[in-house]
Each structure stands twice: as structure tokens, then as C-alpha cells.
Design a protein with these regions (language model features):
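A domain-start/cap signature at the N-terminus of enzymes
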Residues: 1-40, 123, 146-147, 182-186, ...
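Gly/Ser-rich "nucleophile elbow"/oxyanion-hole loop immediately N-terminal to the catalytic nucleophile
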Residues: 28-36, 82-115, 128-130
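Alpha/beta-hydrolase fold active-site loops
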Residues: 39, 72, 107, 132, ...
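Active-site machinery of serine-nucleophile hydrolases
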Residues: 40, 44-91
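Solvent-exposed loop/turn segments at secondary-structure junctions
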Residues: 46-50, 79-84, 114-118, 140-143, ...
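Primarily recognizes the serine-hydrolase "nucleophile elbow" in alpha/beta-hydrolase
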Residues: 100, 106-159
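The feature captures the conserved acid-bearing segment of alpha/beta-hydrolase catalytic domains
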Residues: 133, 138-216
Length: 227
């Protein structure tokens, strides 16, 4: 009997249905000038807002903030109960929104809190070519993504260095500890990324998103970045 390993191939085609409910906020004046393209924010909520009630998606995040509502198209999808954010779903939704609305595809921004902060790190680092800047709030990610890009994927690494990254965390967060953000930001800086920064609120616990989204500087910073 031959015990040497032999080469084989495997292939299977599966149909995938991607569906999501989402809130859409259009800025005042949208549509008045049919040639104008608008910047877009994709917002990912936390674990507590999962389900089928879209009203709770608006509980936190940029849809409550005038500086965001007045200047951006804001897309806020809802993650189903028991699930986490899917990159395939979010990219398909983003593709659809960009086709149906007057989106400036060079000014697409990504942010999210807690579970959505993890989703922001994951989607932003997996597809940096889609975003001008990202702002993960009280999240974390896999530094191995950065290491692999640094040594094996020059194109992705170039996109990391181009993309603005501003992370936020509460210094007293025990739900997602601040070292999660510190590790990600540290790995990016070590890899040569310069447009990356971290804001720690020393006295904040898990809710670091209220201060973050209430600060108009975040939305000004977004608009300073283009892809």
C-alpha cells in the first residue's frame, strides 16, 4: 500500500442568500443637486442591538448626531440575534447602497461600537481598499492580519498606510479591555502606519461611544480623508 501523500482538488458551489434590515439617513439637501456625491458612514452596532427591532439600532451611534446627519449618508444595518458581523453581508450591502444612492465612493467611512468595534477592525483590515478611514470604538481585532499584510501582501499594506484609523476606548472598560485597542494600534504603528491614533478616556468604562460620537472632531477628521 502506498503511504505517500497524493495531491487532490476539492470544489463545491453553494448558493448564499445575504439579507439585512438597515436604517438609512440621508442628509438635508440630498437630491437637490443631482450631480453631487455624498460621503457615507457605515455604522455597526453592538451586541445589545441585535434582533429584528430596527428602532434599537438608532439608540447609539452617529444617527443621533447633527454633525453626522447633516453631512453624511448614514447606513446602520442590524445584525440578527445570535450572530456576529459578516464581512460578506456588509460588503454586499455597501455595494447595493453605492449603486442606489449618490455616494462618493472615495469618501466611505466605517465605525462601530463594542461588537461593532470588532466588526470595524475586521472589515476595515480585511478590505481597506473600500474605506477612506475607520473608527473602531471599544473593539479589538487580530494583529495577525497586520503581520501577514506587512510581510506577504504589499497592496494591502499600502492601503493600511493610506487609510485613516482612529480607535477609541474607555480606560476602565472591563467588558472589552483597552489593551485590545492598544494591541491593534501598536501593531499598525510597528508596521509603518502613521495615520493611526488611539484615544483613551481615562474614567470611561465600556460606554466610550457616547463621548466619541458626540465629538464633532470625529466627523471633521473623517472628511479630511479620501481614498
Amino acid at each position: 500500500m502506498n503511504t505517500r501523500p497524493t495531491a487532490h482538488k476539492f470544489s463545491i458551489e453553494r448558493k448564499q442568500v445575504l439579507a439585512a434590515d438597515y436604517l438609512l439617513s440621508l442628509p438635508p439637501g440630498y437630491g437637490a443637486d443631482t450631480t453631487k456625491r455624498w460621503p457615507l458612514i457605515l455604522f455597526l452596532h453592538g451586541a445589545g442591538e441585535r434582533g429584528t427591532n430596527l428602532n434599537i439600532v438608532a439608540k447609539h451611534g452617529p444617527t443621533k448626531i447633527e454633525a453626522a446627519k447633516n453631512n453624511f449618508i448614514i447606513v446602520s444595518p442590524q445584525c440578527p440575534d445570535g450572530k456576529i458581523w459578516s464581512n460578506d453581508l456588509l460588503l454586499a450591502l455597501l455595494d447595493d447602497i453605492e449603486k442606489r444612492y449618490a455616494v462618493d465612493t472615495k469618501r466611505v467611512y466605517l465605525t462601530g461600537l463594542s461588537m461593532g468595534g470588532f466588526g470595524t477592525w475586521n472589515l476595515g483590515l480585511s478590505h481597506p481598499e473600500r474605506f477612506a478611514a475607520i473608527a473602531p470604538v471599544c473593539g479589538g481585532g487580530q494583529t495577525i492580519q497586520i503581520t501577514l499584510a506587512q510581510y506577504f501582501d504589499a497592496a494591502t499594506m499600502a492601503n493600511y498606510k493610506r487609510m485613516g484609523i482612529w480607535a477609541f476606548h474607555g480606560g476602565k472598560d472591563t467588558t472589552v479591555t483597552p489593551d485590545e485597542s492598544e494591541h491593534m494600534v501598536g501593531a499598525l504603528k510597528k508596521a509603518g502606519c502613521t495615520d493611526v491614533k488611539l484615544t483613551i478616556y481615562p474614567e470611561a468604562q465600556h460606554d466610550s461611544w457616547t463621548k466619541t460620537y458626540a465629538n464633532p472632531e470625529l466627523f471633521t477628521w473623517f472628511l479630511e480623508h479620501t481614498r
